Amino acid sequence: MKRNVLLLDRISAVLYGEPSDRVWLFVHGKCGCKEEGAAFGEIVCPKGAQVLAIDLPEHGARKEESGFVPWQVVPELRGVMAYLRGRWGRISLRSNSIGAWFSLLALADMPPEQALLVSPVLDMEQLIRNRMGLALVDETQLEREGESAADFGETLSWRYLQSVRAHPITKWNAATEILYAGRDTLTDRDTADAFARRFGCGLTVMERGEHWFHKPEQLAVLNAWEEKHTGPEKSATAMKNSRCASRPSPGGRPGSSSMGAATARESSSEEGSI
């Protein structure tokens, strides 16, 4: 598979695949890096697409940088999308965990044709509030201190919480498929169901899955899911029509299905944290 290392302004990136009119933007999660896009490239590049994977601040070739926060990452992703729009005719998104949340914020007004979200963080405010509860930190204390280092390795930030509240996800128009793990500890099932229902997303659930898809049976499900939802024939219109046809009646799980094991491969999912 062809591989070209790029520098987009200060953003380290790698482009996989032969020249094509279609490209997938690959956005990793916490503890990830752009090289994770190679595994996804092995699936979509033979189908005639390319993959542009980037390093977010504090990750990969940018480990020495600071700024793994929405007020820095969101403008970066918008700049990358503008770059892609100037060079490719069809642009899709493949993202993980908090990388999916950043992407949902950044690309709401410049949506990709298609989006595949793996273990996406869909309600960041609730996640932060849950972690505040675990750390026994209330809002008054967090506002007074600005930041609070929790015993479980995360730093709670008042500025971050305020930014999250000021920028909720209210708009998403891409044809989207979500792969959700039944044992995900960052996003609960009700949140995933509500998001899928609100934005018309397809939702696939691996009941034995974890936020980080890393065990052989989990990697097999990820592999099969990516194979199913990629390819030149998967246009935005076709995806939407397929989901509408299989959507259950109100009160049921929105566009959801369950998957068991298939053939395993190396995964591009990240550590189970944000």
Show which residues each predicted segment covers:
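Conserved alpha/beta-hydrolase
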Residues: 44-63
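The serine-hydrolase catalytic nucleophile loop
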Residues: 30-42, 190
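The conserved beta1-alpha1 loop
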Residues: 25-29, 180
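Short beta-strand immediately N-terminal to the catalytic nucleophile in serine-hydrolase-like folds
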Residues: 93-95, 118
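Catalytic nucleophile-loop/oxyanion-hole region of alpha/beta-hydrolase
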Residues: 59-85
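The alpha/beta-hydrolase serine catalytic core
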Residues: 110-194, 198-205, 209-234
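Gly/Ala-rich beta-loop-alpha elbow adjacent to hydrolase catalytic centers
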Residues: 95-103
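N-terminal cap/lid segment of alpha/beta-hydrolase-fold proteins
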Residues: 1-17
